[in-house]
Amino acid sequence: MNNLKRLTKTIFSCFTLSALLLLAGCETLPPMTDLSPITVIDARQATAWELQGKLAIKTPDDKLSANIYWRHSEDRDELTLTTMLGTTVLTLNSTPNSAHLHIDGKDFRDDNAQRLLERVSGWSIPLADLPLWITGQVGPNDQVIESDSQGKPKQLTNTQTPPPWQVAFLSWQSQSGASVPHQLKLERGDLQLKLQLNQWQALGKPAILVGEQP
């Protein structure tokens, strides 16, 4: 059984178990106590953010759909995939120098999150570039193919590693005061990813009022 089929089976098993146990609601990650919701004019002002949405992965042999929860900051990332009933089936916690993946009841570690996820799941997902695309930004290895009337990217090619990633910004929305993508489609060879951002929240350090102790 390949890695994607194994993960699909894991998600289906968790969904079935959740239904049998009559679980409801969604599991949430523990809060980042050092960060608070903020409003920004431009998504580039947010050095940290959190999102909730849907992720779909498609290959010639299989398909996978899951809820995605992602908290991103300059020095760490916390990514979780869950079933529709909220049961966690995958967590990936990483810093610039370490990564920990928990999947199917097993733990895996590496010093690179993208390499770890590809080794265990078989997905070559551009984790280093996704935070830019999620906030509608263009990276140094990106070539914009088409922009909209407001100058926002509609389609770009990432040429860092062949074959290149083709990224389409299908729709945009206003979240936390800024314009961010609502739907993204990524394609590379026979791998296709679709990401829908249902909620995107900019995060920042809480303001200290005059007279308060730091």
From Swiss-Prot:
Lipid tethering residues (N-palmitoyl cysteine): 26
Domain of life: Bacteria
Gene3D superfamilies, A to Z: Lipoprotein localisation LolA/LolB/LppX
Leader sequence residues: 1-25
Membrane topology summary: Lipid-anchor
Database matches in Pfam families: LolB
Record field: compositional bias (Polar residues): 143-160
The keyword Magnesium belongs to this UniProt entry's keyword annotation: no
Region (Disordered): 143-163
Main location: membrane
Any single GO BP term: protein transport
Keywords: Cell outer membrane, Chaperone, Lipoprotein, Membrane, Palmitate, Protein transport, Signal, Transport
InterPro entries: LolA/LolB/LppX, OM_lipoprot_LolB
GO cellular component: cell outer membrane
Subcellular location(s) per record: Cell outer membrane
S-diacylglycerol cysteine-type lipidated residues: 26
PROSITE patterns named among the record's database cross-references: PROKAR_LIPOPROTEIN
UniProt subunit comment: Monomer.
Family statement drawn from the similarity comment of this UniProt entry: Belongs to the LolB family.
Function in brief: Plays a critical role in the incorporation of lipoproteins in the outer membrane after they are released by the LolA protein.
UniProt-recorded name of the protein: Outer-membrane lipoprotein LolB
Gene label: lolB
